[in-house]
Amino acid sequence: MFTGSIVALVTPMDEKGNVSRSCLKKLIDYHVANGTSAIVSVGTTGESATLSHDEHGDVVMMTLELADGRIPVIAGTGANATAEAISLTQRFNDSGIVGCLTVTPYYNRPTQEGLFQHFKAIAEHTDLPQILYNVPSRTGCDMLPETVGRLAEIKNIIAIKEATGNLTRVHQIKELVSDDFILLSGDDASALDFMQLGGHGVISVTANVAAREMADMCKLAAEGQFAEARAINQRLMPLHNKLFVEPNPIPVKWACKALGLVATDTLRLPMTPITDHGRDIVKAALQHAGLL
C-alpha cells in the first residue's frame, strides 16, 4: 500500500468553496478503477493550508468513508508546530487510516536536530505508520539524509516522500536506512529515474488526471521493465512539468475539471483560478498525453 502510484488527491469544492462530497466520491471511484495504490488526503495538493482544522479532519474521514475499504487512505497531518502535528495525527488513531504524511515544519525552519525531535515526538504519540515529507522548495527547510537515517531507526517511521528532485538523495538515504525503509518520490518528472535507482514509488500530482498511466508506469518499473515504463513517462512528461506552470494545485484542479472528474476548479484564497495562459499550457499537455 505504500509503494507504486499514490495520488496526492485534490480536495474538490463547489462554486461557494464548500467541499463537494459527490465529486470526492467520483475521484475515489476513478482511482479505485484505475489501479492507484493509495490516496493521500489533505496534503499540499489537497489544500491543507486553506482548510480549517475541523474541515481537515472531516475531509480525511469522508475520504475514508467513501473509499469503504477499496483503497488505502493516508492522512496529511503535517504542521510547523509539533504539538499541532501531534494533535492532527492523533485524531486518526484507530480510524482506519493506514498512515500519516508529515511534512517538515515550514517557515520557522528548524535545525536538523529540531527536525529529528519534531518527528520523533509525533512518532511517540501515535502507532500510525509515519511517512516523512521533505519538500524544501515549499518549506524553506531541507531534511538531510543523515537526519532521515536517524529517524528511520524509530519503529513507526517507515518511509519518506523525497521531493527535492535531487536523485543523489536516493543513494544517500539508501546507505543510511534498512532495506525495508520505503523511498517515495515527490516529484513526478523525476519519479521514474528515482525508482530505477531503487525508489519504491511516487506520491503523485499527475495521478489526479492520469491514474492508469501512473499506476502502469510504476508497476512496469517495479518489474524492471524500464523501457516500457519510460514510453509512458515520455507521454506524460509535459504534464508532469506543466501541472506546475502555476502554483500547485491551481493547474491540476483545472485539469480535473477539464476531464470531468470534478464539477469546478474552485480554490480558496489566496489561491486563485488558473490564468488563460496557464490553462492553454495545461490543455496542450493533457492533449500530448492523450487524455483530452
Swiss-Prot record:
<keyword id="KW-0457">Lysine biosynthesis</keyword>
<comment type="pathway">
    <text>Amino-acid biosynthesis; L-lysine biosynthesis via DAP pathway; (S)-tetrahydrodipicolinate from L-aspartate: step 3/4.</text>
</comment>
<comment type="function">
    <text>Catalyzes the condensation of (S)-aspartate-beta-semialdehyde [(S)-ASA] and pyruvate to 4-hydroxy-tetrahydrodipicolinate (HTPA).</text>
</comment>
<keyword id="KW-0028">Amino-acid biosynthesis</keyword>
<protein>
    <recommendedName>
        <fullName>4-hydroxy-tetrahydrodipicolinate synthase</fullName>
        <ecNumber>4.3.3.7</ecNumber>
    </recommendedName>
</protein>
<comment type="similarity">
    <text>Belongs to the DapA family.</text>
</comment>
<feature type="binding site">
    <location>
        <position position="45"/>
    </location>
    <ligand>
        <name>pyruvate</name>
    </ligand>
</feature>
<comment type="subunit">
    <text>Homotetramer; dimer of dimers.</text>
</comment>
<feature type="site" description="Part of a proton relay during catalysis">
    <location>
        <position position="107"/>
    </location>
</feature>
<dbReference type="InterPro" id="IPR020625">
    <property type="entry name" value="Schiff_base-form_aldolases_AS"/>
</dbReference>
<feature type="active site" description="Proton donor/acceptor">
    <location>
        <position position="133"/>
    </location>
</feature>
<dbReference type="InterPro" id="IPR005263">
    <property type="entry name" value="DapA"/>
</dbReference>
<feature type="binding site">
    <location>
        <position position="203"/>
    </location>
    <ligand>
        <name>pyruvate</name>
    </ligand>
</feature>
<dbReference type="InterPro" id="IPR002220">
    <property type="entry name" value="DapA-like"/>
</dbReference>
<keyword id="KW-0963">Cytoplasm</keyword>
<dbReference type="InterPro" id="IPR013785">
    <property type="entry name" value="Aldolase_TIM"/>
</dbReference>
<keyword id="KW-0704">Schiff base</keyword>
<dbReference type="GO" id="GO:0019877">
    <property type="term" value="P:diaminopimelate biosynthetic process"/>
</dbReference>
<dbReference type="GO" id="GO:0008840">
    <property type="term" value="F:4-hydroxy-tetrahydrodipicolinate synthase activity"/>
</dbReference>
<keyword id="KW-0456">Lyase</keyword>
<feature type="active site" description="Schiff-base intermediate with substrate">
    <location>
        <position position="161"/>
    </location>
</feature>
<keyword id="KW-0220">Diaminopimelate biosynthesis</keyword>
<feature type="site" description="Part of a proton relay during catalysis">
    <location>
        <position position="44"/>
    </location>
</feature>
<dbReference type="Pfam" id="PF00701">
    <property type="entry name" value="DHDPS"/>
</dbReference>
<dbReference type="InterPro" id="IPR020624">
    <property type="entry name" value="Schiff_base-form_aldolases_CS"/>
</dbReference>
<dbReference type="GO" id="GO:0009089">
    <property type="term" value="P:lysine biosynthetic process via diaminopimelate"/>
</dbReference>
<dbReference type="GO" id="GO:0005829">
    <property type="term" value="C:cytosol"/>
</dbReference>
